[in-house]
């Protein structure tokens, strides 16, 4: 019962953070971030009063002093992405229903942000002093590319972290067949990221005489070809191989154990045996996310583009 009460208290606290709309809208959202900071100061008074604190625009950095000047950085972010489409419960309601907490940011990543602050709050309440300085970095522009203000400050202060802990994977029930329990999927590596603008040019004109080979259809054909072609081979990093080895050791299913071991050891045919989600995790993904053409429905553009993430 005590654990259930505590879980519900945490859920209500996260709900309050979700109820503050922190979608990043340049030049128009500082008031919302200030509201979130006020909620957090109420929820985590020891952190806000007992730690050194810096504010960079709406990004926050705290330092919980330790016994040595070695540094651990716990990273998260306050902003969330837009919430379009139909939602079962309003995205900024923080509704607790059906045994779940609903809302934009519940997973990405106000739950994580809350948990970092809550852990430090409870440790401070218990009188604990960390071995290292613990920095809590909570940015406000992660979803839109981010700034480097916190990094610049740490560099200027000569602070070189011994360890960075960022948002990672989840705790999953039964990650492999034959395993009875939950597994924390700890992320120890991260893929790079790039946005590419792909442009097609051609003769424009009026939609009444469209012609052939105009920019938008060519871009459509290009996107279909990219989507249906394996442009980048799947490679197994040392971290990924170790993950598959450990998952194999956990499985009580002999066939699943052999399958996971074959991947870990890169035996012949291992790449062909991967499912789509595994390929996405291990390989380079390509997603077309934005597009642009003419500004009128009856005008064929001379130039059109798509953004490839």
Q: Which residue ranges define each predicted feature?
A:
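Structural signal for hydrophobic packing residues in well-ordered secondary-structure cores
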Residues: 18, 40, 44-48, 124, ...
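A generic structural motif
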Residues: 24, 107, 202-208, 295
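Acidic-enriched catalytic cores of C-N bond-cleaving enzymes acting on peptides and small amides
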Residues: 155-157, 162, 170-181, 186-195, ...
């Amino acid at each position: 019962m005590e654990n259930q009460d505590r879980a519900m208290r945490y859920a209500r606290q996260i709900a309050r953070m979700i109820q503050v709309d922190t979608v990043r809208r340049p030049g128009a959202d500082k008031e919302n971030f200030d509201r979130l900071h006020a909620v957090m100061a109420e929820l985590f008074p020891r952190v806000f009063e007992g730690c050194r604190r810096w504010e960079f625009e709406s990004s926050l950095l705290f330092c919980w002093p330790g016994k040595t000047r070695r540094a651990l950085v716990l990273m998260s972010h306050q902003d969330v992405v837009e919430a379009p489409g139909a939602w079962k419960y309003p995205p900024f309601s923080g509704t607790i229903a059906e045994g779940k907490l609903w809302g934009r940011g519940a997973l990405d990543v106000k739950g994580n942000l809350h948990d970092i602050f809550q852990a430090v709050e409870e440790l401070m309440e218990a009188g604990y002093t960390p071995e290292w300085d613990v920095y809590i970095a909570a940015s406000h522009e992660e979803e839109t590319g981010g700034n480097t203000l916190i990094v610049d400050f740490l560099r200027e202060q000569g602070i070189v972290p011994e360890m960075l802990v960022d948002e990672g994977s989840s705790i999953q029930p039964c990650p492999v067949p034959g395993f009875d329990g939950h597994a924390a999927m700890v992320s120890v590596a991260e893929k790079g990221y790039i946005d590419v603008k792909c442009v097609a040019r051609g003769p424009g004109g009026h939609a009444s005489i469209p012609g052939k080979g105009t920019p938008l259809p060519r871009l459509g054909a290009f996107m279909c070809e990219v989507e249906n072609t394996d442009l980048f081979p799947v490679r197994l990093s040392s971290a990924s191989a170790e993950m598959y080895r450990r998952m194999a050791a956990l499985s009580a299913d002999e066939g699943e154990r052999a399958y996971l071991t074959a991947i870990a050891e890169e035996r012949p045919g291992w790449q062909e045996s991967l499912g789509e989600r595994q390929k996405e995790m291990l390989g380079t993904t390509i997603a077309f996310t934005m597009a642009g053409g003419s500004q009128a429905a009856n005008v064929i553009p001379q130039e059109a583009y798509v953004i490839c993430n």
